[in-house]
Curated annotation (Swiss-Prot):
Record's protein name: Tryptophan--tRNA ligase
Source taxonomy: Bacteria, Bacillati, Actinomycetota, Actinomycetes, Micrococcales
Pfam families, per the entry: tRNA-synt_1b
Entries under PANTHER family matching the protein: TRYPTOPHAN--TRNA LIGASE, MITOCHONDRIAL
Uppermost EC category: ligase
Reaction catalysis annotation: tRNA(Trp) + L-tryptophan + ATP = L-tryptophyl-tRNA(Trp) + AMP + diphosphate + H(+)
Record: residues binding ATP: Q19, P20, S21, G28, N29, G155, A156, D157, I192, K201, M202, S203, K204, S205
EC code: 6.1.1.2
Protein keywords: Aminoacyl-tRNA synthetase, ATP-binding, Cytoplasm, Ligase, Nucleotide-binding, Protein biosynthesis
Keyword Lipid metabolism on entry: no
Gene: trpS
UniProt cross-references to CDD domains, sorted A to Z: TrpRS_core
A GO MF term: ATP binding
Assigned GO CC terms: cytosol
Length: 335
């Protein structure tokens, strides 16, 4: 294992991240983001950010957040984010994120931020919301633009935020001259749904824990959750999100874990009962999650090693970010 600095080269930059507000990653995080990001590490300069500043948009227990950050870092590394290939850093350790966010906040028009559907959805469900929730997309834009990110993996819920980032980059460039690289989306089409309510995404905050496979779940829990997952009465394995959302969800999981296409998976299980697919999927998930859990526990036995990775990577990220801030401040006349 190594925590030495990653050599920055001329490969296109890909930036991704995850909030450590919960100490548990689930299957949706793994298949929808971590697995594909892990495969990018050889072909791109990859930054993976533990977005603890974004976690502050809702109240956090400081000690719990600190512990969860280490736990999430361990799980991400165990799931394939290699600190020898990626710059795995802590957002709060790179103060330039806040510096650029202030600049971009003065480039963003109030109405643009107010139109963000995620803000409208969350603010509609909460009572007293923070200004930080409103400015969340601006900080996200700062995260992306600081590192000259060429590509950003995004799901459907973040596409609007990335489009705002692109708008702000183009606006700044038009006003002050070429400064920012305008990032392109890597659209993540993989969506894993709740096992008990396949109309909604799998989430750490599902209505019932049985709807979510956590990467650190025990083998028994994984088997029970899969075998009890909602399907339908037809017992015909196929893929149709409208009429067969439950079994379609299982088909997607199997396909992602085995690198099969949807069509190949459906053909493999043609004429077989749901129980056969569930049994095979359970076996695969137990193997994958046990491997991740074992590695996670090894890493958590030496938390100082994880902290050293984050400190080293954050120092390197600051060096890159400062070059962007210097460029921006010079254009603005505040340097």
């Amino acid at each position: 294992m190594t925590s030495s600095a990653i050599r920055i080269n001329k490969k296109p930059v890909v930036l991704s991240g995850i909030q450590p507000s919960s100490g548990m990653l689930h299957l949706g995080n793994y298949l929808g983001a971590l697995k594909s990001f892990g495969r990018m590490q050889d072909d791109y300069t990859t930054y993976f950010m533990l977005a603890n500043l974004h976690s502050m948009t809702f109240p956090q227990n400081p000690e719990v957040l600190r512990e969860n950050t280490i736990r999430i870092a361990a799980q991400c590394i165990a799931a394939g984010i290699d600190p020898a290939k990626s710059i795995v850093f802590l957002q709060s350790d790179v103060y330039q994120h806040n510096q650029l966010a202030w600049v971009l906040g003065n480039v963003c028009i109030f109405g643009e931020a107010a139109r963000m559907t995620q803000f409208k959805d969350k603010s509609g469900k909460q009572g007293n919301i923070s200004t930080g929730l409103f400015t969340y997309p601006i900080l996200m834009a700062s995260d992306i633009l600081l590192y000259d990110s060429a590509f950003v993996p995004v799901g459907a819920d973040q596409k609007q935020h990335l489009e705002l980032t692109r708008t702000l980059a183009r606006r700044f460039n038009a006003q002050y001259g070429q400064t920012f690289l305008v990032p392109q989306p890597f659209e993540c089409s993989i969506r894993i749904y709740d096992l008990q309510d396949p109309a909604v995404k799998m989430s750490k905050s599902s209505a019932t824990e049985s709807g979510t496979i956590f990467l650190l779940d025990s083998p028994d829990k994984i088997v029970k959750k899969i075998m009890r997952s909602v399907t339908d009465s037809e017992d015909v394995i196929g893929y149709d999100r409208e009429t067969k959302p439950g079994v379609s969800n299982l088909v997607v999981m199997y396909s992602c874990l085995t690198d099969c296409t949807i069509e190949q998976t459906v053909n493999i299980y043609s004429g077989k009962k749901y129980s056969v697919l569930k049994k095979d999927l359970s076996d695969i998930l137990v193997e994958v999650c046990t491997t991740i859990a074992t590695r996670t526990n090894e890493l958590l036995d030496d938390k100082n090693y994880i902290r050293k990775i984050l400190v080293t990577a954050s120092e390197q990220a600051r060096g890159v970010a400062q070059k962007t801030i210097d460029r921006v401040y010079e254009k603005l006349g505040v340097y």
